[in-house]
């Protein structure tokens, strides 16, 4: 989701290849599809880029407006994007991504709740310092940091943890973005056979 959003935000001319997950939930069974054997993976004008954050940075080289123009704001954006990319393990494990699921009240492990509190603190701090003028983390433009947090937004929508009104407003703004909506529509149109049983039942 994150890499795809960055590619579309940057306006790159690419052909999408959708890889079906295995029944165990692994997204790739053919390591020749990408150097890491994982998705997302981008080939563009001779560049081969894997890992979602690397794809975001590559896209930002071609479309610098994906990051804030101000140096200090840009540092904040990169820091919070990297924190999301490398952390939030408790949230990921307890509340896996399932765009068609509805598991309100489930998955609230202590680790997940701690991660949710941290996400809310990051959002509140970033919006207070840089979010004037629009509904996104850095104001009016949906940028790289918002793309990186889109999977967190998806989890909040599926698992419905208790969050503040300000966080809910941000969640709603991200969900309403045309590219995020396009991702949801594509996901919900995937074949029934692609559903992974262990992600269809809440713990």
Predicted segments, located by residue:
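Acidic/histidine-enriched, glycine/proline-rich intrinsically disordered or flexible terminal extensions
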Residues: 187-203
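GST-like domain detector, emphasizing the conserved glutathione-binding G-site
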Residues: 1-110, 114, 122
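A short structural micro-motif
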Residues: 84, 177, 190-194
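Residue-level detector of family-conserved "landmark" positions at structurally sensitive sites
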Residues: 17, 52, 166, 184-185
